[in-house]
């Protein structure tokens, strides 16, 4: 229902002396102060839906109706008036003033909302939406292919779970979600089940000490190939036991010990093929031959230079022993490469019980010994090569590379060469995203990779050991608050904004408390891999899982969306511009996140569970909240004039700051939203200019950015050979050269939010598609090229302002 923004609304009650307080009982049982602006807004909405002009006389009539309703409540009610009674009084007032068509529209709107509320908890309605392939349902998650049986089964189960969920939730929470005031995430899994969200599973304890998966007890692996295979099996089971992403934290350092076992075996083989009596020249020839075929064995492209000859670990040993060590290194490098390739293919070919590829992230980059370095190299080489004969960009795992001074940040650091490989990989495959070691420690209290795409644990010291613990911890769920709606409902009055804000935070807190309570109802036998065999802990069958959550070991997240839009209500839509912004506007936007952070700290101290502020990725929520607010408030400049809301604290995607300007604006927010954050920059094709990307990475590191993603054109058309940015269409994307949009004849890779996705194969919701279509580059450069039949080149170019 359309409503126009109210400006300068004043009621007689605002300036009247304090009299009897008029109270209202909401549908969810909450009691709040009567606010005449709500009636004025609703009646003006009915006028707008009828295209009726509101002049001075109509303004007076509407205001009189609101005052009459307040007076009648005072006369007729000793306690709070119910919402339904107030609506009846409004309808009666409209009829008495002969506004019959307005009364009918007002009544119909009320009836439609009652029907929507009933439908939300109707299982039959949920199933009907799925059968009718409601876009908001089948395109909610870009990682789910709704055409396949396993996903259809999951969507059916999710639809039933979601309908049941709103009957299980506290009334205030359920009502706020259905109205669009808040969003209770993942209601297709929780609270119907007691599942938790994302995590840093302790795969490393499981690999080291053994575990049971299904009917198979597993011992500790004796090679990196078995370690990689086992970890993908664990990932599959973890993905079936939680609904969020999972991350292999510091994978290069942990995998290194299994690569060392391969090296030891190859060294034994080297003693067999190079016995003590073997002439040195023959041994040297064997090593040269092994090195000569290495580029082919590692699938090097023709233009990639071969790796230099390896050096032995022990340079003081005799020459024959040195050659054995070099030969063992060459063989181990191949074993590492194959293991990382196995992991890449197994993760991408898995489809778990929830009908999707597991949301997996691999964090790496800090290992400096030979084995960890080779693991990093293998991860990059496999990702650069791509999947299959057409070398498709792998969507999973998400790669998160750590940059640290003294390790890889600067020329002269031992792993600086691997930073160069990371840059090459990012320009060709968009991943890795990068995290900056010292900045992550400053923001979150300790170092770790994100859980899934952007959720971060805070630093936590185990009171039993006094040591920092990251692996084996998790997030219990997210509730996101619709910040633009609060601003719209405030009608530009900041005092009113903060009043409504506090009310919404109270409901969001109640929702998060419910999430904690529900997760605590899980038992170890519900998810043995998580609770019994080491991913989260090694509990007994009847132990309480709460010991893994309390004392702030786990996190639960308060999310937000649309700071740009909310601030536009108070400072106008031009408060952010291509190259600068209104400092007062930024301070207001920052004050919202600061206030959320203060509340989370208070709740954590009072309850012993870690509440964190989370910059919600909003893959489909960007569509839902915006759509609901457009229905309620109409098209409001700077707020609902796009079909999406801006993610969290980000610079609006249609503006064109330089990468440095964008990061300068955004850098302060993660320090108050340490439970989840990421920054992005939009680049042209940078494969020929990786140093430009390195300059941005280095700048981000210098100014305190913690986590940075690279968005660059990497789409490919297999019909005409185009490489670059596919053009957005109404439903998807097409090749700008030949118009091809056949998912079997192109590879389109876009960042939906934190993860990458192929929107041609798996279309996304309308709002997210619109958001991607509105993105502009923050740097001038080529955005695509194709070689024509006559051998000439055609290029596409985007000019930054």
Predicted regions and their residues:
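Conserved catalytic cores of very large enzyme subunits
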Residues: 112-116, 120-552, 573, 579-582, ...
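Long insertion/accessory domains within large nucleic-acid-processing enzymes
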Residues: 739-800
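Conserved phosphate/anionic-ligand binding catalytic regions in large, soluble enzymes, centered on
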Residues: 246, 472-476, 550-567, 624, ...
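Charged, amphipathic alpha-helical regulatory modules used
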Residues: 2-133, 770, 774
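Short, hydrophobic beta-strand segments
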Residues: 22, 68-74, 360-361, 565, ...
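Conformational switch/transducer regions in large eukaryotic molecular machines and scaffolds
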Residues: 35, 729, 754-755
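Metallocofactor- and cofactor-centric catalytic cores in central/energy metabolism, strongly enriched
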Residues: 52, 334-340, 344, 569, ...
